[in-house]
Every structure is written in structure tokens, then in C-alpha cells.
A protein has these predicted regions:
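DNA major-groove recognition helix of helix-turn-helix/homeodomain DNA-binding modules
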Residues: 48-63
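Recognition helix of helix-turn-helix/homeodomain-like DNA-binding domains
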Residues: 30-44
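The alpha-helix within a helix-turn-helix
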Residues: 14, 25, 54
Length: 73
């Protein structure tokens, strides 16, 4: 199932941008546990959150989401 795939690169991008899960959770107004699940790809952020994340981290959606993994499903 999709939850087991690495569909997003959020963890990698946070490291590249020198930001923490806690910082992102505060900026988005969601729990640190939720962000942690997104970072480990055990769940995926909804599209609205993905768009907010791209703005906060100054990245493009194509850099955050691994669309090639979606094609394999």
C-alpha cells in the first residue's frame, strides 16, 4: 500500500533546510506526531498541507513528492 512507500522527501528537505519537525509542526499548526509520521512516510500530508509545506520550505512540489513512486502503484 502507498503508506509503506517513500512518497515524500520531507525528512530530507527538512535536513537540507536545517529545520526540525517541531518547527514545521508549529508553523503548520499540527502535532509533532503528525509531522513525524509524514517524515517517515507512515502517512502522507493532504494536498493543502503539501502546498503550505512547499511555501514554508521554499521548495517546489515536484521536489517534495516522489511522483515516480505514484506511477508504480
Amino acid at each position: 500500500m502507498a503508506a509503506n512507500k517513500d512518497l515524500n522527501r520531507l525528512k530530507v528537505i527538512l535536513v537540507e533546510k536545517k529545520k526540525s519537525n517541531l518547527w514545521l509542526s508549529k508553523e503548520l499548526g499540527c502535532s509533532p506526531t503528525t509531522v513525524s509520521k509524514w517524515c517517515t512516510n507512515s502517512s502522507q500530508p493532504p494536498l493543502e498541507m503539501l502546498l503550505k509545506i512547499t511555501k514554508l520550505l521554499d521548495v517546489e512540489l515536484k521536489d517534495l513528492v516522489r511522483f515516480e513512486e505514484l506511477d508504480k502503484q
